Regions:
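Conserved beta-strand segments of alpha/beta enzyme cores
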Residues: 25, 69-71, 186-188
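Conserved core of the sugar-phosphate nucleotidyltransferase
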Residues: 108-181, 188-190
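Glycine-rich N-terminal loop/short-helix segment of MobA-like nucleotidyltransferase
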Residues: 1-29
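The conserved acidic donor/metal-binding loop of glycosyltransferases
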Residues: 102-106
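Short, surface-exposed amphipathic charged segments that create phosphate/polyanion-binding patches used
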Residues: 84-92, 137-139, 201-207
Length: 219
């Protein structure tokens, strides 16, 4: 049986490291805004909540032009809070199970739906590629994720993809999600093919990554 739940897209941030004066949701990859690609990816998901903050009106207009039934949540404190605050706001409008998707993350469609259909609380891991990775340390090198840190390197990076009960995603604080998750470890994990956009080099890599998939994440 296919899993159920709500995808919460955290799209409230200012994307300052890209230097484009745009929220990452509106930054174009292969000619389309990132959030448009994400909504293509989520075409088979019924419940989607988009959390907005910086340039909220522009993001809302774009989201609703593509997916009129999407729910919108607001993080009015986007300038002084982290992704965990946005995830908490979005979780208030979600069902019992939440899949958290950062607004700067593009995920291979097949891998995303494999992740979606995991019934347990789970993290999405990949090999480290970003400039400021959150490293995932595994029990005995291959078991559950037992530690998340930006200080000690490992062969795995948490890409920000998370599936968990709503009571977990709504209570991770107002800073970094990985900091809030520490009290909920250990967690299961699967690997995902994805690209995260933090800086201009990541943006160029995202374009190449998406071009390899025909320029689209739609089904």
């Amino acid at each position: 049986m296919q899993a159920s739940g709500t995808v919460v897209i955290a799209a409230a941030g200012m994307g300052t490291r890209l230097g484009l004066n745009l929220p990452k949701a509106l930054v174009e990859v292969e000619g389309r805004p990132m959030i448009a690609h994400q909504l293509d990816l989520l075409s088979d998901i019924e419940d989607v909540v988009v959390v907005v903050g910086y340039r909220a009106r522009q993001v809302i207009d774009l989201v609703l032009s593509i997916r009129p039934q999407a729910l919108i949540a607001f993080n009015h404190d986007y300038a002084s809070t982290g992704t965990a605050a946005s995830l908490s706001k979005g979780s208030q409008a979600a069902g019992d199970r939440v899949v958290a998707l950062d607004g700067d993350l593009l995920v291979d469609r097949g891998d995303f739906y494999t992740f979606w259909n995991c019934n347990e609380a789970v993290l999405g891991l990949t090999r480290p590629t970003t400039g400021r990775p959150v490293y995932a340390h595994l029990h005995d090198g291959g078991g559950h994720v037992v530690r998340l840190t930006q200080d000690d390197t490992s062969e795995w990076e948490w890409c920000g993809l998370l599936a968990a009960p709503r009571q977990v995603t709504a209570s991770l604080g107002s800073g970094h999600v990985f900091s809030g998750l520490r009290s909920h470890l250990p967690l299961d994990w699967i690997t995902v093919d994805c690209v995260e956009v933090d800086d201009p080099d990541d943006l160029a890599r995202a374009g190449s990554w998406l071009a390899e998939r025909g320029g689209s994440l739609s089904g």
